[in-house]
């Protein structure tokens, strides 16, 4: 009985120690990352297209470093200073389905893909990888996110910044 109690107490403690607080690493904003997946049946490549900032984060705020589902692609975000994984997610893309088609043996194509990630407070390293049906990585790209980079486009609207005036005043009508 004593061993069971100690084991349960130790388990609860280890879960609490490993729990990650969303606000420690992320702003309440969304980072939209646009990639282009290109290639054919034998070779695939990933290119970073654009980074955008959106006003709110509507995704999960718990179990951020855990992979929720298995897919044929994966995105991992790590804190640059510590190397700690702070966010992971998986996906399946139309490009990876197309690669298995007969057409992919004859021509190369590119597919646009957009992913929504929590907006990091500090510099982060993002790795995106595409996997085959055996979960072997076919292509990957690692790039840095600098949160205050002027090349991250501001998108969406923050309703608190919008000023709504009376229509009659704008037209000069009394």
Regions found by a protein language model. Name each.
Residues 162-174:
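Single conserved hydrophobic/aromatic residue that forms the stacking wall/gate
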Residues 1-22:
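Bacterial Sec-dependent N-terminal signal peptides
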Residues 20-113:
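N-terminal prosegments of processed precursors
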Residues 107-161:
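Extended acidic/polar, glycine-enriched regions
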Residues 10-13, 72, 173:
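Intrinsically disordered, low-complexity segments enriched in Ser/Pro/Gly/Ala and basic residues
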């Amino acid at each position: 009985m004593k061993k069971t109690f100690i084991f349960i107490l130790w388990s609860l403690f280890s879960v609490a120690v490993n729990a990650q607080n969303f606000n420690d690493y992320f702003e309440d904003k969304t980072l939209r990352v646009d990639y282009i997946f290109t290639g054919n049946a034998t070779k695939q490549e990933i290119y970073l297209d654009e980074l955008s900032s959106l006003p709110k984060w509507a995704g999960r705020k718990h179990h951020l470093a855990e992979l929720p589902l298995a897919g044929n692609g994966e995105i991992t975000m790590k804190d640059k200073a510590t190397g700690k994984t702070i966010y992971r997610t998986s996906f399946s893309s139309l490009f990876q389905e197309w690669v298995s088609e007969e057409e992919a043996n004859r021509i190369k194509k590119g597919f646009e893909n957009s992913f929504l990630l929590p907006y990091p407070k500090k510099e982060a390293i993002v790795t995106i990888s595409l996997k085959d049906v055996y979960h072997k990585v076919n292509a990957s790209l690692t790039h840095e996110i600098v949160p205050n980079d002027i090349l991250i486009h501001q998108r969406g609207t923050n309703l608190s910044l919008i000023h709504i005036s009376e229509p009659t005043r704008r037209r000069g009508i009394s």
